[in-house]
UniProtKB/Swiss-Prot annotation:
Compartment(s) where it occurs, according to its Swiss-Prot or TrEMBL record: Cell inner membrane
Pfam family, one: ATP-synt_A
Gene: atpB
HAMAP family with a match to the protein in the record: ATP_synth_a_bact
Protein name: ATP synthase subunit a
InterPro entries: ATP_synth_F0_asu (IPR000568), ATP_synth_F0_asu_AS (IPR023011), ATP_synth_F0_asu_bact/mt (IPR045083), F0_ATP_A_sf (IPR035908)
Similarity comment: Belongs to the ATPase A chain family.
Subunit organization: F-type ATPases have 2 components, CF(1) - the catalytic core - and CF(0) - the membrane proton channel. CF(1) has five subunits: alpha(3), beta(3), gamma(1), delta(1), epsilon(1). CF(0) has three main subunits: a(1), b(2) and c(9-12). The alpha and beta chains form an alternating ring which encloses part of the gamma chain. CF(1) is attached to CF(0) by a central stalk formed by the gamma and epsilon chains, while a peripheral stalk is formed by the delta and b chains.
Transmembrane segments: 29-49, 84-104, 114-134, 140-160, 181-201, 203-223
Entry GO MF terms: proton-transporting ATP synthase activity, rotational mechanism
Keywords assigned by UniProt, alphabetized: ATP synthesis, Cell inner membrane, Cell membrane, CF(0), Hydrogen ion transport, Ion transport, Membrane, Transmembrane, Transmembrane helix, Transport
Tagged with keyword Transmembrane helix: yes
Amino acid sequence: MTHSPLAQFDIKKLIDIKMFGFDVSFTNSSIYMLLASILALTYFYLAFYNRKLVPSRLQVSAEIVYNLVADMLNQNIGVKGRKFIPLVFSLFIFILFCNLLGMTPYSFTATSHIIVTFTLAILVFLIVTIVGFVKHGLRFLTLFLPHGTPLWLAPLIIVIELFTYLARPVSLSLRLAANMMAGHVLLKVIAGFTVSLMIYLKFLPIPIMVILIGFEIFVAILQAYIFTILSCMYLNDAINLH
């Protein structure tokens, strides 16, 4: 029987847990998010626990990732953004490892579920809002009224800017979840046809499949980068009011 391409996204309970009337069961999504966190911690521990003047390849790769995030913050926020390196770096690494872990056979892609990506997006949204009010007080509300806006146009602009601001976590989460789900569905569908196509095209479908997998790995890395760079831009709006 041919399985549905969407079956790979099914949430399955591993340990049934009820707490205060809420279902907080440990699922396959939970275990893969936990596994992604453990793999990330292990990777950076092995890369930095014995740092050398002449770095190993593992240390070089870890430093490249760190510098990538540091540059994102520096280019978008400036020196003031350095204090947010732990937050943004953790966000990028968690999403990256969840995305890449989902590329392994018979695994689960936690970031293909909107509840996971929306939680991350809401976290960014709340931090940005709190930082904005803590740093600027009520002046943060001027974010919704660009400087130089005509008075008669102000009510409309405020509504549009407020709606755009509130829509940030929705667009941020949907973009990541939709791209990860679409890519995996495409791979599943094409993989299902590969065996049949090999009867007529011999081994031609195999390199095509390899290319598609390589492209999906690129998308997994790119989506982690896009989520993070947008988070940096939102932080910049809160720190450096325009």
